[in-house]
Amino acid sequence: MSSKSIESKNPSIKFGPLIRASQFFYTKSNLITALLATSVFAGYLLFFLTGKGKAFEVANSSIKSLGTSLGFGQVEILAFLAERSDQMINDYINFNQVWDSLFALIYGVMYVAWVSILFKPYSKKVGVLNLLPFAQVLFDWFENFSLATLSKQFLADGTISSSTALIASTSSSIKWVFSLLVYGVILVGAVMRIVGAMKRRSQR
């Protein structure tokens, strides 16, 4: 029997690493780890990432940030880069490649921990749903490295690639769609846990 036929009969073989990662977070996540991850997220955002962002901040800029908007075009990207010095653009490249990419991983782990806690009693039904936040992280990384590539090109010749700009914009839009989905999943999970607790209480 071929390996392909075995995989078709047993999908868990094909998606083994994904399933193991999902089970790991369901097993290890608890209120303490989720609160710890949330504290790391808040501390990194307030005391570190914000400071790194000020390195390329321009007073009264028409476009203060690209990554926080729901998509953007070539005009917005060019306007953003044209307002900044070469040193600011280099800082922006470093910000996207290192600090903001690390931030994405931090918030991804935090959201995965919370989703894992909320859906732990239903883990066999919802499967790898707890890994949904990592999809947001993935597209955040696509956006970051696309913006870094565009910034490097702008420094080199003053232009940007339309195809790379489209990748950056599309990745940003998809990132925010997944963000809304994650918040929706967390809300549904919280409601399910509250309703479940109320039912158990009424049965006593």
Predicted features along the sequence, with ranges:
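Alpha-helical transmembrane segments of multi-pass integral membrane proteins
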Residues: Q136-V191
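Hydrophobic core of alpha-helical transmembrane segments in multi-pass integral membrane proteins
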Residues: A34-L49, G108, A113, Y183-R193
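Interfacial segments of alpha-helical transmembrane regions
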Residues: N30-T38, S116, P121-L138
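Hydrophobic alpha-helical transmembrane segments
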Residues: F95-S116, Y183
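N-terminal signal-anchor transmembrane alpha helix
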Residues: F25-K64
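Extracytosolic (periplasmic/ER-lumenal) interhelical loops and adjacent juxtamembrane/interface segments
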Residues: G53-I93
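Membrane-interfacial loop-to-transmembrane-helix junctions in polytopic alpha-helical membrane proteins
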Residues: S22-S29, S85-F95, P121-V128, I160-I174
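Short, Lys/Arg-rich, polar N-terminal cytosolic tail immediately upstream
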Residues: S2-F24
